[in-house]
Design a protein with these regions (language model features):
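Short, surface-exposed loop or secondary-structure junction motifs
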Residues: 1-228
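Short, small/polar residue-rich loop motifs at catalytic or cofactor-binding pockets
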Residues: 235-237
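Hydrophobic-ligand binding "helix-grip"
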Residues: 232
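Short acidic-glycine loop/turn motifs at beta-strand connectors
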Residues: 128-129, 244-246
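Residues that cap or initiate secondary-structure elements
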Residues: 222-223, 247-249
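Short, well-ordered beta-strand micro-motif
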Residues: 217-218, 242-244
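Short, well-ordered beta-strand elements
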Residues: 240-242, 248-253
Length: 253
């Protein structure tokens, strides 16, 4: 991996990319609409057959800045997904099913919609000309509705409100699944909902009293978005969730 400079040249990494950099999006990987879109990278991902292939192609494209120098929301979570595959010896799909979904009883969460679940998929609406109208069939918009062997770390899962509630409850319960199985250590949870950016530039939402933990936004102060310590994130088609660990509350919408 090399680093893009202001004059269009590239230089070597000044320091290694860490897992913390990947979780807090300070590794330097841009999003699909940034440098990788310009280099035709998005087109490559739609034809990819494995996460390993995507990450190898990603490594050929210069990153935006030196690791740790700036917050740049991008493909870091996809890289984390590949790291899980390399460390576990399993695909990301296999790992999540065994280590997370089964212990939590998340039976309707998967990377690809089955024929049965495709019929259950929530219809989408769009707001145009002052009114709502039905969007085109949802499955036509979603690449993960098709049976392709591609599992990305940061996108692609389909789920239900009930399944995602199980995930949120696990985080409130100190990382424990029903039956007492410890999925995440309490120390890990504290890192997740603690601001990891500090004075690192690039995170525009800091002006609203928000920070960024390990993979989620976090509220550093009580504000219009919620209480201090609340963390959460959004998903496809304006879905969202937040968790308040201190008051043991969560919301999914």
């Amino acid at each position: 991996v090399r680093v893009k400079t202001a004059d269009g040249e590239t230089v070597p990494l000044a320091k290694p990319i860490t897992y913390r950099d990947l979780f807090r999006h300070t590794a330097g990987f841009a999003g699909y609409d940034g440098l990788y879109h310009q280099d035709g990278f998005w087109g490559k991902t739609t034809r990819a057959k494995s996460l390993d292939w995507i990450i190898r192609e990603l490594a050929k494209v210069p990153i935006e800045h030196q690791p740790g120098d700036k917050y740049t929301y991008g493909m870091s979570t996809a890289v984390l997904g590949r790291a899980i595959e390399a460390l576990s010896g399993r695909t990301l799909d296999q790992f999540l099913r065994k280590e997370l979904f089964r212990p939590l009883g998340m039976k309707n969460t998967r990377f690809h919609l089955t024929k049965r679940n495709r019929k259950r998929f929530q219809p989408l609406s769009v707001f145009e000309d002052g009114d709502y109208r039905a969007a085109k069939p949802a499955e036509d918009e979603l690449p993960y509705a098709k049976e392709i062997p591609l599992y990305l770390g940061g996108e692609g899962l389909t789920s239900t409100m009930a399944d995602y509630a199980r995930f949120c409850q696990m985080l409130i319960d100190g990382g424990k699944a029903p039956g007492g199985i410890q999925l995440l250590k309490p120390e890990t949870l504290k890192l997740i909902w603690t601001d990891q950016l500090g004075d690192i530039p690039g995170y525009d939402d800091r002006k609203n009293g928000n920070g960024f933990g390990l993979g989620f936004y976090v509220l550093n102060d009580f504000n219009q978005y919620g209480a201090e310590g609340v963390f959460g994130w959004g998903g496809y088609h304006t879905t969202h969730f937040w968790i308040d660990p201190k008051n043991e509350m969560y919301a999914i919408y």
